[in-house]
Amino acid sequence: MIYEKILLKVLLGPHISEKSSTLSGNFSTVIIKVSICATKLEIKRAVQNMFNVAVKNVNTLVVQGKCKRKKSRITCSSNWKKAYVTLKRGQNINFIGSSE
């Protein structure tokens, strides 16, 4: 029970972009924003439990936050982590939902 609550905090949401839609259509890979301290194994288990799909591979990377200057102040956004989750053949996750 406690472990399932931890897995729910791992996934933050989908990363929607042109590249992510191309990857999901051609290579059955989805891009998900995850917690900065999440490991590949935790991400794999969280996706399998939440979406009931078989995961083939998980690749992660940390996106560095950008610093922007407004007048005399410099503000920096925080770093965040995204995961490229490759699903096994025939599996699909549809975040947007289709009307078909």
UniProtKB/Swiss-Prot annotation:
Protein's name according to its UniProt entry: Large ribosomal subunit protein uL23
Q: Which family does it belong to?
A: Belongs to the universal ribosomal protein uL23 family.
Instruction: Record the organism.
Output: Buchnera aphidicola subsp. Baizongia pistaciae (strain Bp)
Record keywords: Transferase included?
A: no
GO terms assigned for molecular function: rRNA binding; structural constituent of ribosome
Q: Which InterPro entries match?
A: Nucleotide-bd_a/b_plait_sf (IPR012677), Ribosomal_uL23-like (IPR013025), Ribosomal_uL23/eL15/eS24_sf (IPR012678), Ribosomal_uL23_CS (IPR001014)
Q: How does it assemble?
A: Part of the 50S ribosomal subunit. Contacts protein L29, and trigger factor when it is bound to the ribosome.
One GO cellular component term, please give it. Answer: ribosome
Q: Which UniProt keywords apply?
A: Ribonucleoprotein, Ribosomal protein, RNA-binding, rRNA-binding
